[in-house]
């Protein structure tokens, strides 16, 4: 029998935080949309057909979970995926779900 690899508690905590971040339909949908590129909260709200405050709430959680990056461009606030690893993770989740 092969011994499982040892994973640090910090790494496990980060993995749990990421999974919690995706555990809501709106959050996962936001992540899927951001795979296509940057978007404003208003653009995301229009696509989701929800009030912008709903999107703002979910974006806060996604930023806290390090699944989404926020940046300012003039008066606009843009959100995007932080890296290619996050985009692959979203793709893997969708494939697991049979999408």
Model-based region annotation:
Residues 88:
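Internal catalytic or translocation cores that form aromatic/hydrophobic pockets or channels
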Residues 83, 98-99:
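Histidine- and aromatic-rich ligand-binding microenvironments
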Residues 9, 13-53, 73, 77-85:
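N-terminal helix-turn-helix DNA-binding core of bacterial DNA-binding proteins
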Residues 91-95:
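Alpha-helical "hinge/linker" immediately C-terminal to small N-terminal DNA-binding modules
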Residues 1-10:
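Short, intrinsically disordered or compositionally biased N-terminal tails of bacterial proteins
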Residues 58:
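Residues within the DNA-recognition helix of helix-turn-helix
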Residues 46, 63-64:
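Alpha-helical residues within the helix-turn-helix
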